């Protein structure tokens, strides 16, 4: 994904692991970008990012406190935005089983709120981050992300004559992201490590690899 000097970008979940890496990459590669908005509900993490990216050095960076469950707040944040990267989600698999409606409210209803808010504004492209767990899901988290994916892809069929494209990007486990196994290993580095799930193997991508990846968007995404 490339941005021009006039690009106005908003990232939901902008204070998360991916969001922080995305913001840093965009500011490094496209320092002349017109606007980059971090949309998230975590006030403390926004403050921490403001210390990392001071406004004196990065005047194009803005912070917007809000929740994707709130469509009206989303609509306000999207004013003047042309590109949206959707990274906001609840993602802890065990937590989803005990709090199913909370995951549905954020991952499914939140996605629909974003779709409708984008259709009501001048956004021209939306990239939603997904997960390999949405393919043939075996848990509630994966099921909510599959529903989210379907909502974004289906939005291409209801956009009418609006110049907007919705896309979904799926990737696997990300090393170093919040809730991944790497931070757990680091926290246990001074203790004895018990080996569990000896028969299971997983593939994982580095956070840098994910945030460095270029996504090619077509004006009319292929539906499958």
Task: Describe the residue ranges of each PLM region.
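Short, conserved SAM-binding/catalytic segment
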Residues: 49-58
């Amino acid at each position: 994904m490339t941005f021009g000097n006039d690009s106005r970008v908003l990232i939901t979940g902008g204070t998360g692991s991916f969001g922080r890496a995305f913001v840093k990459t965009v500011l490094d590669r496209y320092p002349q970008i017109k606007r980059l908005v971090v949309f998230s509900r975590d006030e403390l993490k926004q403050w921490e990012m403001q210390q990392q990216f001071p406004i004196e050095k990065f005047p194009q960076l803005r912070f917007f406190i809000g929740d994707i469950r709130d469509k009206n707040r989303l609509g306000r944040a999207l004013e003047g935005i042309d590109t949206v990267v959707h990274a906001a989600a609840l993602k802890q698999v065990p937590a989803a089983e005990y709090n199913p409606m909370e995951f549905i409210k954020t991952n499914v209803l939140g996605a629909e709120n974003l779709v409708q808010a984008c259709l009501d504004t001048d956004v021209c492209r939306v990239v939603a981050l997904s997960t390999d767990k949405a393919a043939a899901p075996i848990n509630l988290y994966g099921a909510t992300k599959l529903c989210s994916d379907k909502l974004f892809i289906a939005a291409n069929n209801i956009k009418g004559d609006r110049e907007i494209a919705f896309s979904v990007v799926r990737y696997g486990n990300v090393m170093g992201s919040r809730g991944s196994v790497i931070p757990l290993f680091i926290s246990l580095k001074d203790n004895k490590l018990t080996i569990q799930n000896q028969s299971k193997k997983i593939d994982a991508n580095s956070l840098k690899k994910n945030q460095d990846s270029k996504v090619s968007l077509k004006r009319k995404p292929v539906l499958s």
